UniProtKB/Swiss-Prot annotation:
<dbReference type="Pfam" id="PF01824">
    <property type="entry name" value="MatK_N"/>
</dbReference>
<dbReference type="GO" id="GO:0006397">
    <property type="term" value="P:mRNA processing"/>
</dbReference>
<dbReference type="Pfam" id="PF01348">
    <property type="entry name" value="Intron_maturas2"/>
</dbReference>
<dbReference type="GO" id="GO:0008033">
    <property type="term" value="P:tRNA processing"/>
</dbReference>
<keyword id="KW-0150">Chloroplast</keyword>
<keyword id="KW-0819">tRNA processing</keyword>
<dbReference type="InterPro" id="IPR024937">
    <property type="entry name" value="Domain_X"/>
</dbReference>
<protein>
    <recommendedName>
        <fullName>Maturase K</fullName>
    </recommendedName>
</protein>
<comment type="function">
    <text>Usually encoded in the trnK tRNA gene intron. Probably assists in splicing its own and other chloroplast group II introns.</text>
</comment>
<keyword id="KW-0694">RNA-binding</keyword>
<dbReference type="GO" id="GO:0009507">
    <property type="term" value="C:chloroplast"/>
</dbReference>
<dbReference type="InterPro" id="IPR024942">
    <property type="entry name" value="Maturase_MatK_N"/>
</dbReference>
<keyword id="KW-0934">Plastid</keyword>
<dbReference type="GO" id="GO:0008380">
    <property type="term" value="P:RNA splicing"/>
</dbReference>
<keyword id="KW-0507">mRNA processing</keyword>
<dbReference type="InterPro" id="IPR002866">
    <property type="entry name" value="Maturase_MatK"/>
</dbReference>
<dbReference type="GO" id="GO:0003723">
    <property type="term" value="F:RNA binding"/>
</dbReference>
């Protein structure tokens, strides 16, 4: 990264990064190759039909030239069996190196964002900003804020249909025209390759296991675009009143695309070029909070009385996605519910607002009286059924939760098998440490323990009872009880997982910066 930063700083300004020449540098594909090998949470080596995992710059250059050619590989395929066999070999040959280009695109697109992030923290003089990235830091925020709110909107952010929209969003950040031009070519060809996987069962497996770093970054830029305009409308609705206003955004391309925007429930906003002819004061709410992670978001509001304000924002999102990103969104993607009666799923937890009624005796001179007090607390529990479904998809158990062996790991050494199962147990134990009912994890622990024993028994052609008797009842136990001393902004982790009373204690690990794959049920 230092070498890349040195290259970019040779220009006159950091605002004019030329990323296209970096596509022809050997070390870019070495970085992409190393990242793709080390990024999977489940160590399952992937082989692409005889091709090794070594990248070649010459072959990548040939693939780039082929993408630019008018007669692409896909258009030259006919229905003859011989040509279909040739296409099959060339397809996976091209797929492997297209995956390398995809990873390289992801690395290069991250450069401008990472440089801005580093420069930002240098300006505000924050040296250790890595601890600020913990996704568990969201839950103390929710505990502090949601206890005073009444309604929450559970939002499932839709995926854009056209890749061209994602490239257009990147134009606000990257001014390298050749790089963006080639990115459009690549995404178009990638979409064509992906569309041919319907009848190739084996091909679907390969694509399902590959690392989509570039597409995650494109999706995050799209989510940032949504949040940028949402935050603008939210800010203007809070500060502005019933008068007309002029231009508020520099991003004029948003308003040039539509003439008017009509929202149901007494909201009508006319957008004509750069002017608001109608104010947003009906959206005013001083108690509103928005939190997003990956493809899900929550919008919480005080919402006194009826949830009319939440419905207004709901229809605003629908029309915003329709007119700005040109795709329809289904109503089920935004679900509004009162916090006192319903729970919402977010970041691998089922969260709800508990209300405890207490009677407090007050003494005033010679008189005493009782006062009813309501104490609200955010309760976070582990969704066991959803977690079992995730384990079922990963082939650790059946849909009903019956443990099964992991055949793909049966060829590994015993130490590696124990390490793989132990790593998953440790991740789940640490991630769900903030649950108010840790006893729900005992069933997950049972499934992983039996699945590990069945995998070892399958490898050695023995019985599960034999291995459980040999390894004892402490199989994988150390991975649930082990605690590491990790740098934290608030406190070190010292409380074991299953000590007496620890099932009631909630611990938020501030070193978790990435959601566990088994937690991301979607």
């Amino acid at each position: 990264m230092e070498e890349l930063q040195g290259y970019l700083e040779k220009g006159e300004s950091r605002q004019q990064h030329f990323l296209y020449p970096l596509l022809f540098q050997e070390y870019i594909y070495a970085l992409a190759h190393d990242y793709s090998l080390n990024s999977s949470i489940f160590y399952e080596p992937m082989e692409i039909f005889g091709y090794d995992n070594k990248s070649s710059l010459a072959l990548v250059k040939r693939l780039i030239i082929r993408i630019y050619q008018q007669n692409s590989l896909i258009s030259s395929v006919n229905d003859s069996n011989q040509n279909r066999l040739l296409w099959h070999n060339h397809f996976f040959y091209s797929h492997f190196y297209s995956q390398m280009i995809s990873e390289s695109f992801g690395i290069l697109v991250e450069i401008p964002f990472s440089l801005r992030l580093v420069s930002y923290f240098e300006e505000i003089e924050i040296s250790k900003y890595x601890n600020l990235r913990s996704i568990h830091s969201i839950f103390p925020f929710l505990e502090d804020k949601l206890s005073h709110l009444n309604y929450v909107s559970d939002i499932l952010i839709p995926h854009p249909i056209h890749m061209e929209i994602l490239v257009q969003i990147l134009q606000c950040w990257i001014q390298d025209v050749p790089f963006l031009h080639f990115l459009q070519f690549f995404l178009r060809e990638y979409h064509n390759w992906n569309s041919l996987l319907i009848t190739q069962k084996k091909s679907i497996y390969v694509f399902s296991k590959e690392n989509k770093r570039l597409f995650r970054l494109l999706y995050n830029s799209y989510a940032f675009e949504c949040e940028f305009l949402f935050x603008f409308i939210r800010x203007q609705s809070y500060y502005l009143r019933x008068i007309s206003y002029g231009t508020f955004l520099e991003r004029t391309h948003f308003y040039g695309k539509i003439e008017h925007l009509q929202i149901e429930h007494f909201i009508f906003i006319v957008v004509c070029r750069n002017y608001f002819h109608r104010t947003l004061w009906l959206f005013k709410d001083s108690f509103m909070h928005y939190v997003r992670y990956e493809g899900k978001a929550i919008l919480a509001s005080k919402g006194t009385g009826t949830p009319l304000l939440m419905k207004k924002w709901k229809y605003l999102f629908f029309h915003f996605w329709q007119y700005y990103f040109h795709f329809w969104s289904q109503p089920y993607r935004i679900h509004i519910s009162p916090l006192s009666k319903h729970s919402f799923y977010f970041l691998g937890y089922l969260s709800s607002l508990l209300r405890n009624f207490l009677a407090v005796r007050n003494q005033m001179l010679d008189n005493s009286f009782l006062t009813d007090t309501i104490i609200k607390k955010l309760d976070t529990t582990v969704p066991v059924i959803l977690l079992i479904g995730s384990l079922s998809k990963a082939k650790f158990c059946t849909v009903s939760g019956h443990p099964i062996s992991k055949p793909i790991w049966a060829d590994l050494p015993d130490s590696d098998i124990l390490d793989q199962f132990g790593r998953i147990c440790k991740n789940l134990s640490h991630y769900h440490s903030g649950s108010s009912k840790k006893r729900d994890l005992y069933r997950i622990k049972y499934i992983l323990r039996l699945s590990c024993a069945r995998t070892l028994a399958r490898k050695h052609k023995s019985t599960v009872r034999t291995f459980l008797r040999r390894l004892g009842s402490g199989l994988l136990e150390e991975f649930f009880t082990e605690e590491e001393q990790v740098l934290s902004l608030i406190f070190p982790k010292t409380t074991p997982f299953i000590l007496h009373g620890s099932h009631r204690e909630r611990i938020w690990y501030l070193d978790i910066i990435r959601i566990n794959d088994l937690v991301n049920y979607s």
